[in-house]
Amino acid sequence: MRQKTQWETIRKVLRYIRRYRIYFVASILLASVNVFGTLMIPKLVGEAVDQMLDTGQVFYEGLFAILWQIALFTIIASVAQWFMNLSNNKMTYSVVRDLRRDALEKIETLPLSYLDIHPAGEIESRIIADADQFADGLLMGFTQLFTGVMTILGTLVFMLSVNTTLTLVVVVVTPVSFVMASFVAKKSYHFFKQQSEIRGDQTAYMNEMIEGTRVVTAFQQQEKVIEDFSVINRELTDVSLKAIFFSSITNPATRFVNSIVYTSVGVFGAFFVMSGGVTVGQLSSFLSYANQYTKPFNEISGVITELQNAIACANRVFELLEQPSESPERAGAVSPENFDGAVEFSHVDFSYVKDQPLIEDFSLEVNPGQRVAIVGPTGSGKTTLINLLMRFYDINSGKLAIDGLSIEDITRQSLRNGFGMVLQETWLQTGTVRENITMGNPTISEEEMIRIAKLCHINGFVSRLPQGYDTVISDDGGDFSQGQKQLLCIARVMMGQPNMLILDEATSSIDTRTELKIQEAFQHLMEGRTSFIVAHRLSTIRTADVILVLKDGHVIEKGNHASLMEQRGFYYNLYQSQWQH
């Protein structure tokens, strides 16, 4: 099964290489020229030796002619090798570039369920670290494998032209190297694959801990974090040592075999010289060829070991690429440019895990322009409703429609373009403030941008930056406070002018003073737009047209703030408990 997996991975890699077949062919041709030039040199050296020994005198004219030929073939071989390396580099890094691009494109199409259960660090490790390891192995394979195989074939031809018996001595002993390399390759692949997987776990854990440094410090969990990391580190060290142990056997073992070959040729060759079967110059050439013949076996065995690591890493990247994407768009799905904002849930059932229902028989009608607040305890299904609206997940049964159209009959791009979404977790990209806030509407005018910036209360602190709206910020927001980053995200949504809004915990990380400032802006933004508001701070949703109180996936109360307070039910108790605190 493992062997089958390796060959499947190799076939997938070859499909990428096929795109750059011109470099592949060029590498083979250049490798042939390099090998031919290299192998001509021992032949010429042997001729020079025989010329001097046969006559006992040195004919400088003939010797210089041979030396010029040696110099010419040396230059040809060197130039061919240089261009071969350029071609190999171009092919390798083009393949890795395509692989990374496809991996990133794949991430953009993966269902949220995959991203929910796979840490970001583990995915990053596949795209960055594993792709780098794959590139190193592939480059070594192209650089040494082509030349090595051709050197073996070329030296075999040259040795046969000198003496068949001596050639048989070399050929009979050398296959021992292949047997050793095959054994080592099987063993090392298993450990290199484990090494890649644990490296991914280590990267994921590091990312998680770095992002949560404040929490770790606040709860004095440094020792536990170090202990947990040490466990992963020890596992990686153990597996790496095993992988290196088996891969390190290859070189000394094959060198030992090569020494036997070289010694055998020397002994048998001496008898042939004494019997007149070969000349001293021919034996000199043959010894050089024997060395060149056995050397690639040593290199190829090392390359095979490195390729095992590369294949293991490539397999992890392909595992990501082969994950099922979001379900395809339904045939005939439409792409409305605008939505009125009428939303209908009709007997909707949904569960993240089979046989563990979260939302059951949920029904709701929302008229265009209504503001719907969703409240309830943790795990009640608040965020799940948002996930269903954005079609991050598909409902199990029932119907979810916008403007009378089932959301499955609307393309995901059009559906998601119709919503403006403010999340609790702020997300900014490296770039200017302007690029961040106009992401959803790059063509917005300067005047309109400033107007909305003032409504969102960002114009003041942005204008004080060194380059104002053209100041470059990092993805973590740099020196901006959490509240300022939240305001930037809100401004980004407002500038996109969406038809519908989703405010998921939008003001939970903003201080009371800042919260009061943005409420006015939100009122302006929500005017005439269907809005869904998820918040734990009930004081922020008192103006909602409809408040849904969820518990265990069911609507247990429904109404506006005043009517729900009059009922003195779950919402009333929840509101009172927050007000008192």
Q: Where are the model-predicted features located?
A:
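A short amphipathic helical element positioned immediately N-terminal to and/or at the very start
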Residues: Q6-R19, I123
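An intracellular "coupling" helix at the cytosolic face of ABC transporter transmembrane type-1 domains
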Residues: L112-S113, A129-L138, F142, M150, ...
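A hydrophobic transmembrane-helix motif
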Residues: M40-P42, G46, I75-I76, Q81, ...
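Short intracellular "coupling" helices and adjacent cytoplasmic loop segments at the cytosolic face
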Residues: M1-Q3, Y93, R101-S125, A129-A131, ...
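ABC-type nucleotide-binding domain
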Residues: E329, P336-H581
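Transmembrane helix-loop-helix hairpins at lipid-water interfaces of multipass membrane proteins
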Residues: F24-A80, S87, S161-T165, G276-V280
